[in-house]
């Protein structure tokens, strides 16, 4: 007599919600945002996952922010909806709220209200408050009020678009320096 058992291993996520469009993972605190950065930067797949901010988030307690999607092999590819909320005191010398954002990603309805991205003496490339680098992502109704510094590809919203212009930026604006 032989028996076969099938086991499905489901990773426990640190956020409330199920990550679907109807029940996105909820980002309510700085700790939740750090957990998202850690998750994507550990090469976890974010494609087809949905995240929604449920409150304004102050990153003032962090000495420096590590962007979500720290390099081109760790791109964020999900949907992040700020729902009109803001990020305050974002300080990063390696990108913006997001680092590398890839095909399939949508970043929407979020503002970086204050902070410093890059440094006044920086000659490095790729700085943007919402994302430093995009490869086919959509940015909708995002805004920036932080100071963004860089010597190469630097922008208030996105530092560079590396996909032949297939990314879209719609309804976004910059009031930062």
Regions found by a protein language model. Name each.
Residues 1-5:
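Extracellular and select intracellular beta-sandwich modules with Ser/Thr-enriched
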Residues 9-177:
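Surface-exposed repetitive/solenoidal architectures
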């Amino acid at each position: 007599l032989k028996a076969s058992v099938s086991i499905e291993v489901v990773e426990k996520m640190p956020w409330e919600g199920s990550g679907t469009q109807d029940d996105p993972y909820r980002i309510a605190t700085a700790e939740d945002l750090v957990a998202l950065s850690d998750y994507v930067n550990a090469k976890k797949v974010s494609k087809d996952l949905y995240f929604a901010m449920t409150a304004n988030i102050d990153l003032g307690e962090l000495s420096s922010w590590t962007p979500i999607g720290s390099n081109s092999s760790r791109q964020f590819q999900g949907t992040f909806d700020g729902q009109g909320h803001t990020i305050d005191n974002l300080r990063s010398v390696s990108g913006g709220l997001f680092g590398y954002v890839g095909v399939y990603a949508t970043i929407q309805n979020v503002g970086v209200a204050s902070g410093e991205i890059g440094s006044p003496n920086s000659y490095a490339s790729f700085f943007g408050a919402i994302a430093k680098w995009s490869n086919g992502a959509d940015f909708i109704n995002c805004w920036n009020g932080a100071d963004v510094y860089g010597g190469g590809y630097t922008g208030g919203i996105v530092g560079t678009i590396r996909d032949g212009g297939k990314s879209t930026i719609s309804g976004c604006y910059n009031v930062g320096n």
